[in-house]
């Protein structure tokens, strides 16, 4: 309770000093209170309480201003200001004060009224002395803004941010009002002039001045008004950025990011409005006299540019999908996906083009016109070219895919196994085996394989049998080849290895009638020993042939 009382006293004393409401925000009040109380931060409940107290003080200020309006009515009547359709005494009083100060405080407005009115009236006041019609127009605009500003004040259920918009309404409300009719500035100007002429009955001197001003310095005043509106738009943007920063701080506490998106939309509308104004100003400088044409062009420039920008984007997306269709195997379904993707890109390009300058819009329009002029025959040629390209690419793609296709398709064709051996992975493993110093008959080794996966597994097994460990590489293969050559050399030099080893089969004797193969050790010993120790073979037995052949040619 003590802290709440302290906050209440602080807000009362703070608003008694009449602060500048056009730049005042909740975060500024919070910082001032922290500096006043000497604390580093506030709790969320304290922040809400401080917001509520600030809103109460603002409502009290409005009540006090309503009481002081009646006193100021006499002053504005004495100042001989022309009566306006919406004669707000508070606005009249402020205009009187600003003119008495001779426009010196245009940038820092008086603090007797809400900031939405003050910003408009203070910036338009130097032009009012030269052109009373402009003054009446500014007053009408501000009266519309006040009507919109009073709505959130009447609704007590709305959030504190929306009430803050109502009190500091210029930063939020004015872009929305202008968004409703961005290209109808000249129409509102005419209406304002007609109403001001009907209402101005008494001063004859002022009407004469108006006629002179209209005849002599019409173009100069219009250019001045345009420059003033540009300054207003710049100030609006600055204030919008400040309000966005506050919203970010508050949203970080609450976790709600919706207001920021709203303010971004308003900033877009303000930029669109500024681009329309620049167009209309350029046309006036060039000397376009027809005001109706200006209205039509300004009103339809945004919509037409958005509408005309669609066909080139769609055409580009169609060409892209046609080119992609030849490269891919499944054409129609992926074309639909591509066209679906093309729509959001078209929307995004439309948004960027709206935010861009008028030169970008004109270049887009020229491009669209050139595309539409070059339509018909050239477009058909383009489509024919793209279809030819896609058919060519489809042929090459189908041939390569058939080479890498399923094993069933390969089994039905002649020489399909040979094509499988040309697979890059198979060729690489063959090169590794060759680098290891081994030579294999791949026709026998890979003849029974149906797919390149089987070939790869067989070749990897061969590499492992040769002694390859891990992923094969040419460096490992060279090292393995050296090891194998070294082992072969050692084996050839080892005598015991030669005798016992089963190398290439050699023919030791022409024919052994006994059918007994002599052991290899016996053969080696026979060559080393002397002739005496060699066993003699038994003499042949010819007894069974004695009756057939006799030595003397006679038979018994």
From Swiss-Prot:
Pfam families: CHZ (PF09649). Residues 64-426, 502-556 are annotated as: Disordered. Keywords: Chaperone, Chromatin regulator, Nucleus, Phosphoprotein. GO terms for biological process: chromatin organization. Residues 240-254 have a biased composition (Acidic residues). Residues 403-527 are annotated as: Interaction with the histone H2A-H2B complex. The modification Phosphoserine is found at residues 27, 87, 98, 100, 125, 142-143, 159-160, 196, 199, 223, 227, 289, 291, 330, 332-333, 357, 359, 363, 370, 372, 530, 550-551, 555. The keyword Ligase does not apply. Widely expressed. Isoform 1 is predominant in skeletal muscle. Isoform 2 is predominant in liver and heart. Residues 99-108 have a biased composition (Low complexity). GO terms for cellular component: nucleolus; nucleoplasm; nucleus. This is HIRA-interacting protein 3. Interacts (via C-terminus) with histone H2A-H2B dimers; the interaction is direct. Interacts with HIRA. Interacts with CK2. The gene is HIRIP3. Residues 168-177, 260-269, 385-396 have a biased composition (Basic residues).
């Amino acid at each position: 309770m003590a802290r709440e009382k302290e906050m209440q006293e602080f807000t009362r004393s703070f608003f008694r000093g009449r602060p500048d409401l056009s730049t005042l925000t909740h975060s500024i009040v919070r910082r001032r209170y922290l500096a006043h109380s000497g604390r580093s931060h506030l709790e969320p409940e304290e922040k809400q309480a401080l917001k509520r107290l600030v809103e109460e003080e603002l409502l009290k200020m409005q009540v006090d201003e309503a009481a002081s309006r009646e006193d100021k009515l006499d002053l504005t009547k004495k100042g001989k200001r022309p009566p306006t359709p919406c004669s707000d005494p508070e606005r009249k009083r402020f205009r009187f004060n600003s003119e008495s100060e001779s426009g010196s405080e245009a940038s820092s407005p008086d603090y007797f009224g809400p900031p939405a009115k003050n910003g408009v009236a203070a910036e338009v006041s130097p032009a009012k002395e030269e052109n009373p019609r402009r003054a009446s127009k500014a007053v009408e605009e501000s009266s519309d803004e006040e009507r919109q500003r009073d709505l959130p004040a009447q609704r007590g259920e709305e959030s504190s941010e929306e009430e803050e918009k109502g009190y500091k309404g210029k930063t939020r409300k004015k872009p929305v009002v202008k968004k409703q009719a961005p290209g109808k500035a000249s129409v509102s100007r005419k209406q304002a002039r007609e109403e001001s002429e009907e209402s101005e009955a008494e001063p004859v001197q002022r009407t004469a001045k108006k006629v002179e001003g209209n005849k002599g310095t019409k173009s100069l005043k219009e250019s001045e008004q345009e420059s003033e509106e540009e300054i207003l738009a710049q100030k609006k943007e600055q204030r919008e950025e400040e309000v966005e920063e506050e919203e970010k701080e508050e949203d970080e506490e609450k976790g709600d990011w919706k207001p920021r998106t709203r303010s971004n939309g308003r900033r877009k509308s303000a930029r669109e409005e500024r681009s329309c104004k620049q167009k209309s100003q350029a046309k006036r400088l060039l000397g376009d006299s027809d005001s109706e044409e200006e209205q039509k062009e300004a009103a339809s420039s945004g919509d037409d540019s958005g509408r005309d920008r669609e066909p080139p984007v769609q055409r580009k997306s169609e060409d892209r999908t046609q080119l992609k269709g030849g490269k891919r195997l499944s054409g129609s379904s992926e074309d639909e996906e591509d066209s679906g993707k093309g729509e959001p890109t078209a929307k995004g390009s439309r948004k960027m083009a709206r935010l861009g300058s008028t030169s970008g819009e004109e270049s887009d329009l020229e491009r669209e016109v050139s595309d539409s002029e070059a339509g018909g025959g050239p477009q058909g040629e383009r489509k024919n070219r793209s279809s030819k390209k896609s058919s060519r690419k489809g042929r090459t793609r189908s041939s390569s895919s058939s080479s890498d296709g399923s094993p069933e398709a390969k089994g039905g064709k002649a020489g399909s196994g040979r094509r499988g051996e040309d697979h890059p992975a198979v060729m690489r493993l063959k090169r590794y085996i060759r680098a290891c110093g081994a030579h294999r008959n791949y026709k026998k080794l890979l003849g029974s394989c149906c797919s390149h996966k089987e070939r790869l597994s067989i070749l990897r097994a061969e590499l492992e049998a040769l002694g390859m460990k891990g992923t094969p590489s040419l460096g490992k293969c060279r090292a393995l080849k050296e090891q194998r050559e070294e082992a072969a050399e050692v084996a050839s030099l080892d005598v015991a290895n030669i005798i016992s080893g089963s190398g290439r089969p050699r023919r030791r004797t022409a024919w052994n009638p006994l059918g007994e193969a002599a052991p290899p050790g016996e053969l080696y010993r026979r060559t080393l020993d002397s002739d005496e120790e060699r066993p003699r073979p038994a003499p042949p037995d010819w007894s069974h042939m004695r009756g057939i052949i006799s030595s003397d040619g006679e038979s018994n």
